[in-house]
Amino acid sequence: MADDTAYILSEYLQTLDNVPNETKHIFDEISVKEVAVHDIWKRIQAADSQIQSYIKSHGSLTPHPKEDALYSTIREEYQKAINIQNEKVQLADRARLGLTRHIKRLDDRLAKAGHGFTAAELLNAPDYYASSPYGGYSPSGASSARQTPAPSRSGASTAGRRRTSATTRGAIQNGVYHSPYTASLADSGSTRGQKVSNATATTQLETKADSTTPNEMVSEEDMEEDNEKYCFCQQGSYGQMVACDNANCEREWFHMECVGLKAPPEGTWYCEACRDQKLVDAK
């Protein structure tokens, strides 16, 4: 069993060779779009300054000769900025989905190995994740608030579960766009892993904002929305989530704020319903 798991992990790591470059490409695009938003903001400020300067010189009762045109320009520029920001959210979701697909693939194979499958059977089986949108993320603004993984029921074993955190938006610092977005697969302090964001993507002004590569990480069909409901609140996946260690837990995944957790729990953790049930069973 240990040899099978090690073999699966070794093969799995080889599939991650292109992930850094693919993720960096997406965040380079986000960086270029951020520069475009900055340019739009400067144009908005320039138009507004014309109006404000005229008011200071002629008073607020005398309209600027081009006031209507300037206000129209400002509204159009704001709409452009909103559209670009939405595109940035879509790109971030695409990167997140790609990383989640890789994690789910490993979870699924390890879960199968734990049920008697051999490494050869797992690695020779058709790759379900290569052709199926098994990430549950939509690039639309509706899903941007979730910014989380879509927990998989297939990874019911404790070792296969992961606690995940929301996407952290990058910031422009000294002209470099810092966009944290890589995953850490192991957390030695608990039975579940935890994804940690810590990567950067540098601005490349010559890159086209709408550029794509033949080796696109995620296809459009991978962007289908996850309609699964989790937690006591029966909402979709968003923010930080933690898995109940009861393999038969009805809900399995919970939003940390809903269960009163400020930080990921150490060791075994059960939801309130499972804790109550264990007390009943113990009587």
From Swiss-Prot:
Biased composition (Polar residues): 181-216
Zinc finger residue extent: PHD-type: 228-277
Binding annotation for Zn(2+) 1: C231, C233, H255, C258
One Gene Ontology cellular component: nucleus
Compositionally biased residues, Low complexity: 137-171
Main location: nucleus
GO molecular function annotation: methylated histone binding; zinc ion binding
Pfam family, one: ING
Record family assignment: Belongs to the ING family.
Name of the molecule in the record: Chromatin modification-related protein png1
Protein species of origin: Schizosaccharomyces pombe (strain 972 / ATCC 24843)
